[in-house]
Structure formats: structure tokens, C-alpha cells
């Protein structure tokens, strides 16, 4: 894949058309879960995205752990998100035991990898601890800094990378 990603970010990647365009261009592309606020909207957008993707092409789903309503609807109890190529867990990191159980469950459901989007040194370390518990599944870390006003982080990206890169 080209070295560029269309990361999930509400409101931009709530629309399946931009996600499909990037994915069909062979880029990592994420449908933003933050704007999928009802089961009907989520199902409509997933169906539209599926129709727009070329054969053999897939997209990832960006789920917001911080929002209990969306998390439960999309990933938790109702599990409305079908198999995507990956699930990106953002806006918070579950506790280690909960995260390991979730990763194993998603792996059993056919997700070939899981991504986390930590925005703090402590969160990066948490994701590394989670990854050590599930060596059979690739865990992707998408580190976010706080330059954009702290939406996902208040920490400087350079400091995050310097403090965690060697781990």
C-alpha cells in the first residue's frame, strides 16, 4: 500500500464516499465511528461503503472507546460493525485485561489485525503491554500528538515518539 492513510476523523470520514475513494486508491482508509450515531446510519454507511469498494478492496473501522454509547453499539454488545480489514480503537485505550479479551474476540471474528491510536506516553506503553499478550495478532499503533488542539492528545508528538520509539 502507498505510505499514506486516511485516518478516521469525524466529520470528514463519516461519509463512505471519501473512504471508498482512498481505499480504492490502495490507501489505508478508515470509516469514522464518531459520526455513526444511530444503528440505521451505521448500517446505511456500511452498506454504501461496501457497494463503493472495488472487489478485493477493504476499509478499516475507527471506533471511539471513549464514547460508551457508540462503543456498545458498534463494537460491544450489539456488534453492528461487520468484519472490516481492521478495527482502530481510538479516543481512549481499554484496560489491559479488557483489551486483550477484546482483541482475542475480534481475532476469532476474523479481524486480521487491530490498531490502537494512543495519544500519550502512558497509552503507548499500555498498547505495547496489550500487544505482548497477543503475539499471534499484529497490533498497529497510530500515535497522535496534540498539535491539533488536543482532540486526542495534549502531548507533543516528538516527545511521544522519543519517549516510546525504542520500546
Residue ranges with predicted function:
Residues 1-166:
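Active-site entrance/lid segments in N-terminal catalytic domains of soluble metabolic enzymes
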Amino acid at each position: 500500500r502507498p505510505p499514506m492513510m486516511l485516518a478516521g476523523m469525524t466529520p470528514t470520514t463519516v461519509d463512505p464516499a471519501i473512504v471508498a475513494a482512498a481505499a480504492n486508491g490502495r490507501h489505508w482508509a478508515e470509516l469514522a465511528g464518531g459520526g455513526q450515531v444511530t444503528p440505521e446510519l451505521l448500517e446505511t454507511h456500511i452498506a454504501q461503503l461496501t457497494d463503493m469498494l472495488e472487489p478485493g478492496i477493504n476499509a478499516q473501522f475507527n471506533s471511539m472507546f471513549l464514547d460508551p454509547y457508540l462503543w456498545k453499539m458498534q463494537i460491544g454488545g450489539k456488534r453492528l460493525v461487520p468484519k472490516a480489514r481492521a478495527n482502530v480503537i481510538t479516543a481512549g485505550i481499554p484496560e489491559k485485561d479488557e483489551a486483550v479479551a477484546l482483541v482475542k474476540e475480534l481475532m476469532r471474528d476474523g479481524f486480521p489485525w487491530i490498531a490502537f491510536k494512543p495519544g500519550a506516553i502512558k497509552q503507548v506503553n499500555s498498547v505495547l503491554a496489550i500487544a505482548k499478550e497477543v503475539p499471534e495478532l499484529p497490533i498497529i499503533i497510530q500515535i497522535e500528538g496534540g498539535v491539533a488542539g488536543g482532540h486526542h492528545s495534549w502531548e507533543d508528538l516528538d516527545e511521544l515518539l522519543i519517549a516510546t520509539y525504542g520500546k
